């Protein structure tokens, strides 16, 4: 069979764009199959990238030469670092984006990607031979051959839009859903469910009374997502803050029965951490107000995205409650809000590569795996694209551990625990978050990316230059030291134990900055500012990271205890029916992964460990 493509990616959203670009960077002849070129890179919901936990994912995507960080930098019109007053481990870079600029930059980035073709059409069926995907069949009957395929359907998989009693089949407002592909996947026996998400009404900024609203300014020193972005060139704009009122809540309560979520029309679970305004009013009935961020959708666009009031109430009810909100008394609605319900596949159907267990060569990424958010989708797309290309080329799987990336945390959570509601990334999900900071994503991942072959020449050169500069700076610091008495003469407070301390160790002190040390040793002034900032962060965390390193090494020992594919869980006596069923379904690759399965007990882990050791001994 002549293979037209090595990898076919279905869908041109955030997951699909990253998957296609990643596969192509790996050298795979790649096709991005999308309904329309014009919709590639669309921001379907909020016009923003990053945030707490999410910003870490964007930096990790960038560290592996992905697109989202660079595209967000090209489109960003308000950059802010969330949690700036807290430690670097939990700071979240975020950017408000110009929708038009984002789509333009994403399409340009894909156009510049070698080995990548854009194909218009709707994926309708899979070609399967001997339990493996060999191609995609489009709705108009074209057969596209491939060695691996990545499905990134977002909310399109049998999507249905709800607004009051009005329903329509759609993947996004004004766009057809993927009905036949959903039927194909269901017919193949995948465990599927329904989830829902929502979006707020879009407002005409010219009809908003901005006087009296709180202003949210951008950071004075915008921090790019990408290490390849020298500076942010777009004008930076303000956002504004308003709030719901008692009158708003009364309108919503009086009409709650018209919400499809509360009328029973929608059965899918929505995202807990991004609830609709109806959910907020019902769940937090003691609150008289909820914050709303009025976010401009572009530099040359008067459309305003009111972040915080997604809704599926009827259009006339939306109009009524909007007019009870300060500043929106005479607002014109450009597009009413709505909820969308869609199919997802239980992510426990997946390996840690995001390849399905049922069909070889079929990878899934994004909302089809039960996640919510652009960043979560894009990160999965990157992982799926890398692994699809590796499989197509006969290479080894590319795995991300919990101890090395938020991407590893997310994938492990999905494939081990599954989802009952849309999954969102938070820093609190990572047990090693002191190591997994947004500022060191390149130090954690770019070296691995170079080995895998997904890093381009520009990033490779920039990374090597940065690492050399960091090494030089550390070398400079190691060349200077002080006794406690000498340190005291310079105003540095350390224990008077007679022990000399090097400059890097001194930098770890809470009240010591590199500027103080540069005053003592002027030679340190040759360290450039960006490297100096990184060195300071590394020094402040050094003691804690040394402790965490031991935990990580212990975890990696457990990860190295692999469970052979040949293990028959039905033959293991002493396991409960529930645990046996979960082990059969998930088929964990290691003892460490098995320990994270919901409901796993110490007794079950002991039995499993004994089995692994016995099988290992027999094989030797």
UniProtKB/Swiss-Prot annotation:
GO cellular component: cytosol
Annotated GO MF terms: flavin adenine dinucleotide binding
Cofactor: FAD
Binding site for NAD(+): 270-284
Name of the protein in question: tRNA uridine 5-carboxymethylaminomethyl modification enzyme MnmG
Positions contributing to FAD binding: 11-16
Function of the molecule: NAD-binding protein involved in the addition of a carboxymethylaminomethyl (cmnm) group at the wobble position (U34) of certain tRNAs, forming tRNA-cmnm(5)s(2)U34.
Subcellular location(s) per record: Cytoplasm
Keyword Cytoplasm attached: yes
Family listed: Belongs to the MnmG family.
Keywords associated with the record: Cytoplasm, FAD, Flavoprotein, NAD, tRNA processing
InterPro entries registered for this protein in UniProt: FAD/NAD-bd_sf (IPR036188), GIDA_C_N (IPR049312), MnmG (IPR004416), MnmG-rel (IPR002218), MnmG-rel_CS (IPR020595), MnmG_C (IPR026904), MnmG_C_subdom (IPR047001), MnmG_C_subdom_sf (IPR044920)
Complex and partners: Homodimer. Heterotetramer of two MnmE and two MnmG subunits.
GO BP: tRNA methylation; tRNA wobble uridine modification
The keyword Transmembrane helix appears for this protein: no
């Amino acid at each position: 069979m002549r293979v037209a493509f090595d990898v076919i990616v279905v869908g041109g959203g955030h997951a699909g764009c990253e998957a296609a670009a990643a596969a192509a960077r790996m050298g795979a002849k790649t096709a991005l199959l999308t309904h329309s070129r014009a919709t590639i890179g669309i921001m379907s919901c909020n016009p923003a990238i990053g945030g707490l936990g999410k910003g870490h994912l964007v930096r990790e995507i960038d560290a592996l030469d992905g697109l989202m960080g660079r595209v967000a930098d090209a489109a960003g019109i308000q950059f802010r670092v969330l949690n700036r007053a807290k430690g670097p481990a939990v700071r979240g870079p975020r950017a408000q984006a110009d929708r038009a600029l984002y789509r333009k930059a994403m399409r340009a980035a894909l156009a510049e990607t070698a080995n990548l073709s854009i194909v218009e059409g709707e994926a309708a069926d899979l070609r399967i031979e001997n339990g493996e995907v060999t191609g995609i069949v489009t709705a108009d009957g074209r057969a596209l051959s491939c060695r691996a395929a990545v499905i990134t359907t977002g909310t399109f998989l049998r999507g249905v839009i709800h607004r009051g009693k009005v329903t329509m089949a759609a993947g996004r407002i004004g766009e057809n859903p993927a009905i036949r592909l959903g039927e194909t996947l269901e017919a193949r026996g995948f465990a599927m469910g329904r989830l829902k998400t929502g979006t707020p009404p879009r407002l005409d900024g010219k009809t908003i009374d901005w006087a009296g609203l709180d202003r949210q300014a951008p950071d004075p020193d915008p921090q790019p997502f990408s290490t390849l972005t020298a500076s942010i060139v777009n004008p930076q704009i303000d956002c504004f803050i308003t709030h719901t009122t008692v009158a708003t809540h009364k309108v919503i309560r009086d009409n709650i029965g018209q919400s499809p979520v509360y009328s029973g029309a929608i059965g899918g679970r929505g995202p807990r951490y991004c609830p609709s305004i109806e959910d907020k009013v019902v769940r937090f009935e003691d609150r008289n107000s909820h914050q709303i961020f009025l976010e401009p959708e572009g530099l040359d666009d008067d459309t305003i995205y009111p972040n915080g009031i997604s809704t599926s109430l009827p259009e006339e009810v939306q109009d009524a409650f909007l007019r009870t909100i300060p500043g929106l008394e005479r607002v014109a609605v450009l597009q009413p809000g709505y909820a969308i319900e869609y199919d997802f596949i239980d992510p426990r159907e997946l390996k840690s590569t995001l390849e399905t267990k049922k069909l070889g060569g079929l990878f899934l990424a994004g909302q089809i795996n039960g996640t919510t958010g652009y960043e979560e989708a894009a990160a999965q797309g990157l992982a799926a694209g890398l692994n699809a290309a590796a499989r197509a080329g006969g290479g080894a799987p590319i795995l991300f551990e919990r101890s090395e990336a938020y991407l590893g945390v997310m994938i492990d959570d999905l494939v081990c625990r599954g989802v009952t509601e849309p999954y969102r990334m938070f820093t609190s999900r990572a047990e090693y978050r002191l190591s997994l900071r947004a500022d060191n994503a390149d130090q954690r991942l770019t070296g691995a990316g170079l080995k895998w072959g997904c890093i381009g020449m520009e990033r490779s050169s920039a990374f090597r230059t940065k690492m050399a500069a960091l090494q030089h700076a550390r070398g400079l610091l190691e060349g200077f030291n002080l006794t406690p008495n000498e340190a005291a003469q310079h105003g540095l407070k350390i224990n008077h134990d007679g022990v000399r301390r090097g400059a890097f160790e001194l930098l770890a002190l809470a009240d010591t900055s590199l500027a103080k040390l540069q005053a003592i040793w002027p030679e340190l002034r040759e360290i450039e500012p960006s490297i100096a900032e990184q060195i300071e962060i590394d020094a402040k965390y050094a003691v804690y990271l040394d402790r965490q390193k031991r935990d990580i090494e212990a975890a990696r020992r457990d990860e190295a205890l692999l469970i052979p594919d040949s293990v028959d869980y039905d033959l293991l006596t002493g396991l409960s029916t529930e645990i046996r069923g979960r082990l059969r379904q998930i088929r964990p690759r290691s003892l460490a992964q098995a320990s994270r399965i919901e409901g796993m007990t110490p007794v079950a882990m002991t039995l499993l460990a004994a089995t692994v050791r016995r099988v290992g001994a027999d094989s030797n």
